[in-house]
Amino acid sequence: MSKSFTIAIQKEDDWYVAKCLENSVASQGKTMDEATDNLREALMLYYEDESLPIFPQTYVTTMEVAL
């Protein structure tokens, strides 16, 4: 079984931090690929012993704010 998750990746110093928006599971890596691979593994471990809950649809967008 597979499930699609929405993730955000940010560069913090020398690391890329990948975070799942549905459940706040996060991981990091020296490259974006490493961060997403590590997050995939973390999510598999997170849901290893339980069934997947029903997640609400997540929408991601950008907005401009005058500062």
Question: Model features per residue range: what roles?
Answer:
Residues 1-8, 37-67:
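Short, charged, surface-exposed hinge/linker loops at domain edges
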Residues 3, 8-20:
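Short aromatic-glycine-(Arg/Gly/Cys) micro-motifs in beta-strand/loop hairpins
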Residues 15-38, 47:
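Amphipathic, hydrophobic secondary-structure cores in small proteins
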